[in-house]
């Protein structure tokens, strides 16, 4: 525990709990950290530390729902898609307010086993919402009907010589009651 100082780089993601604590992400020379600051005493303590020596990863505090923190650690796509390998992981660490990992979510493409690009959008108290434009993710594959529509749109755009991209956005939710149980059932909510 230490008094607030400026040696840590702090992001703009601030979250508060019911006990008068503020949580924020920061980095030091070798790690991404989640910190807790008691707003009365200004004491700062480290809650969770993720070794981040690799320049290949991008780590973000994706959210806090009053019970869990969602820390998103994924390959840095700005380094170039060709540099991403099957060793690179796309993981969401689900932590309690003491920094204990309660569960992890990993997103990979089914055909190549490489990382899939997803967005963690929070959700509500009951569900965690995830979206993606990748159509080949193990956890929530696009339906055959949606894929047929997508392929038809891609063909039409190619034959018309359009410079626009045909994209599909898949959405799925995870019941937060499944966190920590080992039974993670994704519920597909993408409209057809």
Predicted features and spans:
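Structural motif
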Residues: 30-35, 77-93, 136-156, 163-174
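Short loop/turn segments immediately following beta-strands, especially the blade-tip
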Residues: 177-179
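Beta-propeller fold detector
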Residues: 1-2, 45-51, 102-108, 183-191
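Short loop/turn segments that connect beta-strands within beta-propeller blades
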Residues: 38-42, 96-100
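Short beta-strand elements that form the blades of beta-propeller/WD-repeat-like
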Residues: 15, 20-27, 63, 67-83, ...
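Repeated scaffold domains used in trafficking and secretory/extracellular systems
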Residues: 5-15, 53-66, 110-125, 187-192
């Amino acid at each position: 525990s230490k008094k607030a100082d400026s040696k840590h780089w702090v992001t703009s993601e601030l979250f508060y709990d019911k006990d008068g604590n503020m949580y924020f992400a920061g980095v030091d020379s070798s790690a991404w950290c989640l910190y807790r600051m008691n707003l009365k005493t200004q004491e700062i303590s480290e809650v969770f530390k993720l070794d981040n020596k690799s320049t290949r990863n991008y780590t973000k505090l994706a959210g806090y729902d009053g019970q869990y923190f969602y820390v998103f650690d994924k390959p840095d796509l700005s380094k170039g898609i060709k540099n991403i390998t099957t060793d690179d992981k796309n993981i969401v660490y689900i932590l309690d307010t003491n920094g204990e990992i309660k569960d992890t979510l990993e997103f990979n493409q089914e055909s190549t086993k490489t990382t899939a690009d997803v967005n963690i959008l929070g959700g509500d108290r009951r569900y965690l919402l995830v979206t993606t434009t990748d159509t080949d993710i193990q956890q929530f594959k696009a339906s055959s009907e949606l894929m047929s529509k997508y392929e038809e749109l891609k063909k039409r755009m190619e034959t018309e010589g359009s410079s626009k991209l045909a994209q599909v956005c898949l959405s799925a939710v995870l019941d937060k009651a499944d966190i920590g149980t080992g039974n993670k059932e994704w519920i597909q909510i993408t409209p057809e």
